[in-house]
């Protein structure tokens, strides 16, 4: 038997019409499979540009998300917290401070704008899908359980609703839930104004659960510190932001022990406004009151009007300074400064009143009256220890001693037991009516203005030195 040629057999098979048709069918089937595979790949992946790099990511179908949400909410009771009766729900909190201010010292409150975030695990919201996280808006908030967090020292709080409610909800496939919202809060801050306006304060923002005690809900900080925005845009005006700190504590009440989270914002007051409005004007008024010491003591209208004007001005300044403060019962640093300035101004007016009283109410000398009545006494007046007042000068004889004094330093107090009381004012009431006693303290009337020119500025400078060192450095 002659063996067949393989090449001839292959050629014969190719020429067979049935075999050719069979090969064409297989080729069409193969091409169809390739086309279907390509279309399926295009449907399951979509292209997006990120930094000019093409990446293929899975498409999320709207129907898939709807099915997941419907499955999660089926039989879900939003009135019950996660793990109820098993273990406490741990709430991880975080805060971003958008702005602080203004601070209202009269009402003792401040305004703060924050983004508040809470994260917890709810096993009832676990789902199996290629979608790792569901990014939802505020419409889903009312359908799941949300912590009943409230701000304990809040006087007023507003949630932002423009253009839509500023709330966000995220649900991960492992049951983790993130809930954030934006709030503007008017919080209470008890200001201690003893050192006003050189005071510093630590204003708290406290929050906790309203109805769940520590056995039900535990709050924890997600990060060790709270993040803040650009402080240059904050409307603090009279204050400077110096830092913050966050704490966790347990507060015991009649309804249970609650975990309270607190953020303390440290603020220090700027003195520029009060220096211009109060301190400098008060200092200038005090200095202005010293001008009367250089005015002639006989210029009664000038010195009196100057003293009264400065006193009234100080009263007005003290009233204006108090308008920016609450009606506290204790004395502030500014009250002390204004009060001392008022005392200095009032003392300057009292000094002139004292001087004018003893100058204008001088008594004529008895020896002088006798000389006017008896011409013989005037002729032999050099033999007796009397006072002889002349138009330009006066000769005072004390114990056979002669002293020449100017006319403007003479006053008509009579001498006691031969002593010269005419040029002195005794600090004791019985000086002009009683006997002379050795060791009395005397103040020279004519030199009161001279003494005041030195005493008042020196005392005021010493007060300022002690005042500023005590409040700024101690």
From Swiss-Prot:
<keyword id="KW-0868">Chloride</keyword>
<feature type="region of interest" description="Insertion, similar to human gamma-2 sequence which is proposed to be caused by alternative splicing">
    <location>
        <begin position="376"/>
        <end position="383"/>
    </location>
</feature>
<dbReference type="InterPro" id="IPR006202">
    <property type="entry name" value="Neur_chan_lig-bd"/>
</dbReference>
<feature type="transmembrane region" description="Helical">
    <location>
        <begin position="334"/>
        <end position="358"/>
    </location>
</feature>
<dbReference type="GO" id="GO:0022851">
    <property type="term" value="F:GABA-gated chloride ion channel activity"/>
</dbReference>
<feature type="topological domain" description="Extracellular">
    <location>
        <begin position="39"/>
        <end position="274"/>
    </location>
</feature>
<dbReference type="GO" id="GO:0051932">
    <property type="term" value="P:synaptic transmission, GABAergic"/>
</dbReference>
<feature type="glycosylation site" description="N-linked (GlcNAc...) asparagine">
    <location>
        <position position="128"/>
    </location>
</feature>
<dbReference type="Pfam" id="PF02932">
    <property type="entry name" value="Neur_chan_memb"/>
</dbReference>
<dbReference type="InterPro" id="IPR006029">
    <property type="entry name" value="Neurotrans-gated_channel_TM"/>
</dbReference>
<comment type="subunit">
    <text>Heteropentamer, formed by a combination of alpha (GABRA1-6), beta (GABRB1-3), gamma (GABRG1-3), delta (GABRD), epsilon (GABRE), rho (GABRR1-3), pi (GABRP) and theta (GABRQ) chains, each subunit exhibiting distinct physiological and pharmacological properties.</text>
</comment>
<feature type="signal peptide">
    <location>
        <begin position="1"/>
        <end position="38"/>
    </location>
</feature>
<dbReference type="GO" id="GO:0004890">
    <property type="term" value="F:GABA-A receptor activity"/>
</dbReference>
<feature type="transmembrane region" description="Helical">
    <location>
        <begin position="451"/>
        <end position="471"/>
    </location>
</feature>
<keyword id="KW-0407">Ion channel</keyword>
<keyword id="KW-1015">Disulfide bond</keyword>
<keyword id="KW-0770">Synapse</keyword>
<keyword id="KW-0732">Signal</keyword>
<dbReference type="InterPro" id="IPR018000">
    <property type="entry name" value="Neurotransmitter_ion_chnl_CS"/>
</dbReference>
<keyword id="KW-0406">Ion transport</keyword>
<dbReference type="InterPro" id="IPR005439">
    <property type="entry name" value="GABBAg2_rcpt"/>
</dbReference>
<dbReference type="GO" id="GO:0099634">
    <property type="term" value="C:postsynaptic specialization membrane"/>
</dbReference>
<dbReference type="GO" id="GO:0030424">
    <property type="term" value="C:axon"/>
</dbReference>
<dbReference type="GO" id="GO:0005254">
    <property type="term" value="F:chloride channel activity"/>
</dbReference>
<feature type="glycosylation site" description="N-linked (GlcNAc...) asparagine">
    <location>
        <position position="51"/>
    </location>
</feature>
<dbReference type="InterPro" id="IPR005437">
    <property type="entry name" value="GABRG-1/4"/>
</dbReference>
<protein>
    <recommendedName>
        <fullName>Gamma-aminobutyric acid receptor subunit gamma-2</fullName>
    </recommendedName>
</protein>
<dbReference type="GO" id="GO:0007214">
    <property type="term" value="P:gamma-aminobutyric acid signaling pathway"/>
</dbReference>
<dbReference type="GO" id="GO:0034707">
    <property type="term" value="C:chloride channel complex"/>
</dbReference>
<comment type="similarity">
    <text>Belongs to the ligand-gated ion channel (TC 1.A.9) family. Gamma-aminobutyric acid receptor (TC 1.A.9.5) subfamily. GABRG2 sub-subfamily.</text>
</comment>
<dbReference type="GO" id="GO:1902476">
    <property type="term" value="P:chloride transmembrane transport"/>
</dbReference>
<feature type="glycosylation site" description="N-linked (GlcNAc...) asparagine">
    <location>
        <position position="266"/>
    </location>
</feature>
<keyword id="KW-1133">Transmembrane helix</keyword>
<dbReference type="GO" id="GO:0098794">
    <property type="term" value="C:postsynapse"/>
</dbReference>
<dbReference type="GO" id="GO:1904315">
    <property type="term" value="F:transmitter-gated monoatomic ion channel activity involved in regulation of postsynaptic membrane potential"/>
</dbReference>
<dbReference type="GO" id="GO:0009791">
    <property type="term" value="P:post-embryonic development"/>
</dbReference>
<dbReference type="GO" id="GO:0032590">
    <property type="term" value="C:dendrite membrane"/>
</dbReference>
<feature type="topological domain" description="Extracellular">
    <location>
        <begin position="472"/>
        <end position="474"/>
    </location>
</feature>
<keyword id="KW-0812">Transmembrane</keyword>
<keyword id="KW-0813">Transport</keyword>
<dbReference type="InterPro" id="IPR036734">
    <property type="entry name" value="Neur_chan_lig-bd_sf"/>
</dbReference>
<dbReference type="InterPro" id="IPR036719">
    <property type="entry name" value="Neuro-gated_channel_TM_sf"/>
</dbReference>
